[in-house]
Structure formats: structure tokens, C-alpha cells
């Protein structure tokens, strides 16, 4: 069996997903967590919640830091 290859389209889909505003990302991820009761084990539930919280934390830092990236910081 060959390994699945990552295509250019996969990168475009990923970029399009993460370019969405935080409220839309939260809504979409929340939909995927709606079926958390159907996940087999507690560790899988924790993993799903961890991914969700990582995404929110990452996006919050992005929202806070992005306005400052264009500033001229020459210190």
C-alpha cells in the first residue's frame, strides 16, 4: 500500500480554512465536536477537545499579534 500524498489542493484547503475569522472557525469546529459522545474512548474525546483549544489559542495569539507585525520595531 502506498502512502497518501499531500497535494497542492490540500495546502490550499488548509490555508482557506485557517484564513477564516475566529468566530467562523469556532462555529465549524464546534459542529465537529457535536458528536463527541460517539467517540470511542475518553482519550479520543480529550484529544478532540485539545485540538479545539489549541486552535482557539493559536487564533487568539494571531488576532493579538497581527496588528503589531506591521509596526516598525527597530529596538
Swiss-Prot record:
Query: Family per UniProt?
Result: Belongs to the herpesviridae UL91 family.
By what name is this protein known? Uncharacterized gene 30 protein
The scientific name of the source species is Saimiriine herpesvirus 2 (strain 11)
